[in-house]
């Protein structure tokens, strides 16, 4: 029996593979040494079954790193680097996203939540606010404030964020290397 299916499905496995490849260590060290991985692990368990939601409810609040993770749909392969003071509250986060510290992904009200595509890298201190859609393969620069939609393959920086470059997979082949595919 596959332990990942029992505990949280393919998304948990994709998260583990992503962390393992970037941190170069096994599950025990990831779980004990990296609170971001541990918190994400608990999130996946809560997502997987109502029993886990009840058992892990006390762990939902009071995280020492102030990592708040709340989304209706987070695909596998999410990597949170230094989750200190990071708030993630959105409709969707695509596969293989990378979020750095002090990032805020939030809503202007309960119905206007961000949608984050696949292979998005959100650098330290960036803010993604309101009913915005971030396309696939986007890089959001450090301390950028995104309040408008960002098309796929873009790099955005500044306050408010503006596109400084539109890339292609031909000019940036590394994106296909870091993507993780899990059945």
What residue ranges belong to the model's regions?
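Structural signal for interior beta-strand "rungs" in well-ordered beta-sheet cores
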Residues: 61-164, 168-169
